[in-house]
């Protein structure tokens, strides 16, 4: 199986800021701030109550920045307590009579983004606070910082140099009701900006939705 398939050639549906504001009930000012912070910081966490629509908002935020609905440039995973560097970056896995070095989902996605440096890519992580960031990212923890994008570091497993592309954005999501927030990894706090997602009952988009129902 090709672990880094070529992007689909079919036409993509356009997706604009106006589409986002219609689909996701936040104000235009908050949207502009969210986009500005993500482009500057490269990494952001959407936090809010369960069911408020963080996953929905995260994907449409990516679409709006890309200007189109392109699933080839989005990767979605969910962290859990047993998620590891071997799953995320690379590690040895049983193969035949021995072990074989396998590349993880983030490594492969970075390689895909590096092949298209003029395009924006989005790596979306659900339940990001449930994983051990230092354990999962390893030496890449420094490379995801905005100031270190495109700078190279040597990977422990294969000894090759590696970098995280500048136009790869990481969007994490977490529930504010989660008890593990109190134990939030300092590495996470330092490398990500935080943005609250709340029910947008007073936004123009929601008012238009209610009027359409009446």
Model-derived regions: residue spans:
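C-terminal regulatory/interaction module of P-loop NTP-utilizing enzymes
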Residues: 1-214
């Amino acid at each position: 199986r090709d672990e880094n398939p070529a992007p689909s050639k079919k036409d993509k549906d356009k997706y604009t800021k106006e589409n986002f504001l219609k689909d996701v009930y936040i104000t235009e000012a908050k949207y502009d701030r969210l986009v500005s912070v993500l482009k500057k910081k490269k990494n952001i966490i959407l936090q809010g109550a369960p069911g408020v629509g963080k996953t929905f908002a995260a994907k449409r935020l990516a679409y709006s920045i890309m200007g189109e609905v392109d699933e080839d440039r989005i990767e979605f995973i969910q962290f859990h307590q047993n998620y590891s560097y071997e799953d995320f970056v690379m590690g040895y896995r049983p193969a035949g009579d021995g072990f074989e070095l396998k590349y993880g989902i983030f490594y492969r996605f970075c390689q895909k983004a590096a092949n298209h440096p003029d395009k924006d890519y989005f790596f979306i992580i659900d339940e990001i606070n449930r994983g051990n960031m230092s354990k999962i990212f390893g030496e890449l923890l420094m490379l995801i910082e905005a100031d270190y994008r495109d700078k190279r570091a040597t990977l422990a497993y294969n000894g090759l140099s590696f970098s995280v592309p500048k136009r790869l954005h990481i969007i994490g999501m977490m529930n504010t009701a989660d008890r593990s927030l109190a134990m939030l990894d300092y590495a996470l706090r330092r490398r990500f900006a935080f943005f609250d997602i709340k029910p947008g009952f007073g936004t123009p988009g929601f008012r238009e939705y209610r009027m359409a129902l009446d």
